[in-house]
Amino acid sequence: MSQSFELVSQYKPQGDQPNAIRQLVAGINEGKKHQTLLGATGTGKTFTMSNVIQQVNKPTLVIAHNKTLAGQLYSEFKEFFPNNAVEYFVSYYDYYQPEAYVPQSDTYIEKDASINDEIDKLRHSATSALFERNDVIIVASVSCIYGLGSPEEYKELVCSLRTGMEIERNDLLRQLVDIQYDRNDVNFTRGTFRVRGDVVEIFPASRDEQCIRVEFFGDEIDRITEVDALTGEIKGERNHVAIFPASHFVTREEKLKRATKSIEAELEERLKELHDRGKLLEAQRLEQRTRYDLEMIHEMGFCSGIENYSRHLTLRKAGETPYTLLDFFPDDFLIIIDESHVTIPQIRAMYNGDQARKGVLVDHGFRLPSALDNRPLKFEEFEHKVHQAVFVSATPGPYELEHTPEMVEQIIRPTGLLDPVIEVRPIEGQIDDLIGEINERVAKNERVLVTTLTKKMAEDLTDYLKEVGIKVRYLHSEVKTLERIEIIRQLRLGTFNVLVGINLLREGLDIPEVSLVAILDADKEGFLRAERSLIQTIGRAARNANGYVIMYADRMTKSMQIAIDETKRRRSIQEEYNRKHGITPKTIEKRIPDVIKATAMVAEDGEEYTSHAPKQKMSKKEREAVIERMEAEMKEAAKTLNFERAAELRDLILELKAEG
């Protein structure tokens, strides 16, 4: 269905926005492959991009570098485009411990994961929308470059039903089973169907409230209705409905047979190779595991870890590019890479990290070499799939500078807000000085961000501020991804006034209430005090009319000087514009948006767990708190590839749960 994007907003483009929109749209229409929007913090980059999307009218993929940022962008685009398909596509794992082997200790760790059902639904909604309409915006994390099933297979297996269509009821049931729907007449949930006489009810994988009721008269479809899955209330009549597969990894039976033959051939070849090299243990291990998987595929149509055979299932050659979300888009689509200075390096690093882990599994006989082809895209493959891209950043990185020497600048804010004033103060007595500044802001009902260099300093500072009666929270790396949104929300609501953190950049902290950003140890050169990081951190105070930044330092580093000079340059351009147009700066008014349902279920307590499970008797509540903290540490350990620690924690958690 062809439909145009319809931007709904009470605002009109202002400041630098009209010029930025005009330049970007012209560049896209001229066929430019890469463009960069250098947009200062708070200049309304999302609104600019929304106007660009409306004018070029192409399906758009927006890539953010983490789930938190993707969640914020999803909420904003959904508000701007209420009548179009705005979708969300991130990794559906709440916890993911990849399969791994540690040769030093001869430890094999099985894959372990917990899937978030709400996010899985949103992923299905995203892919099905791309086949049903053109007016689609998908906000995704970098996980969109990981392998998915074949889009052709996915599209071919869509079950298309119309009123008056001749089809036997049992043929429809077989079709549904083929696309991985389960029959369940009792527990009716996403990805299932139930049968009552001549009525078949199907619960699509992309929905969580409404199902499709198909009524038969003999071998003909008599009526199709959309029904509330809980109450049974009819929501509307349908002449046609498309039921998309319940899994992105669907394969026809004949393809499955070809795949198993191909797996067997690879197994024989690999076993010969291992025997020739005298690796008998590895050969025995590989044969046992692969034969078991093949038997499961023969009997059940799938096996645990079937994605490791994806090259065979999609009939690809060794080393061939895997299918990803990008292949589900039509040829002429637009990619917007948000915070590109962070996102591009992340896309570049994905492949190497994945191959290092899988290479160990292959070498030691846990997987066939074809498992290496179940992977994210290499950076060159990603570049090849990009039709047209717009990089968006306040501090573009080397890749953007190389590919788009001429940048589209957006420095003027629609609200007239200026880049903050920066003051450098000595380190001696910095904490007492900071407390005085915090109290001044709290009295005006404003918020403060404090960034430190080490975890220890952040913890000590948080404890000290609490002791002197300041409402403060510490945002550390082990806070669950989706809990961060809730912490940011509480800061905005005034539940607490000061947020302390080490790397406050990655959160995408758009908080208009923040009037002071304090940077401790600003003169300690390194990633967190490099020019890009400093400019990004300074930008956190640019959404408030009283925005102010204090750098505590004993010397002026090159990075500090560049960041201060760039901020002054932008501020002078903004002041000149305000003077010319008679604008008085005013703080951004940004309502606290509704977030994705999956983000609402967050833990009450953000403390981190650092010790083993205590052996003494605990109450149920205490045990639950310990389990929650251990799970946070387990996820962090898996994320940093510390597989042994993650597996150890997983076992301790299972013990504690068993005791409960």
Swiss-Prot record:
GO MF annotations in UniProt: ATP binding; ATP hydrolysis activity; DNA binding; excinuclease ABC activity
Function: The UvrABC repair system catalyzes the recognition and processing of DNA lesions. A damage recognition complex composed of 2 UvrA and 2 UvrB subunits scans DNA for abnormalities. Upon binding of the UvrA(2)B(2) complex to a putative damaged site, the DNA wraps around one UvrB monomer. DNA wrap is dependent on ATP binding by UvrB and probably causes local melting of the DNA helix, facilitating insertion of UvrB beta-hairpin between the DNA strands. Then UvrB probes one DNA strand for the presence of a lesion.
Species this chain originates from: Halalkalibacterium halodurans (strain ATCC BAA-125 / DSM 18197 / FERM 7344 / JCM 9153 / C-125) (Bacillus halodurans)
Keywords of the record: ATP-binding, Cytoplasm, DNA damage, DNA excision, DNA repair, Excision nuclease, Nucleotide-binding, SOS response
GO biological process: nucleotide-excision repair; SOS response
Subcellular location as annotated: Cytoplasm
Gene this protein is translated from: uvrB
PROSITE patterns: HELICASE_ATP_BIND_1, HELICASE_CTER, UVR
Annotated Gene Ontology cellular component terms: cytoplasm; excinuclease repair complex
Residue ranges occupied by any UVR domain in the UniProt entry: 624-659
Homology family: Belongs to the UvrB family.
Motif Beta-hairpin positions after renumbering to this chain: 92-115
Protein's name in the database: UvrABC system protein B
Subunit composition and interactions: Forms a heterotetramer with UvrA during the search for lesions. Interacts with UvrC in an incision complex.
Record-listed ATP binding positions: G39, A40, T41, G42, T43, G44, K45, T46
Annotated CDD domains: DEXHc_UvrB, SF2_C_UvrB
Record remark on domains: The beta-hairpin motif is involved in DNA binding.
Domain Helicase C-terminal: residue ranges: 430-592
NCBIfam families named in the record: PRK05298.1, uvrb
Occurrences of domain Helicase ATP-binding (ranges): 26-413
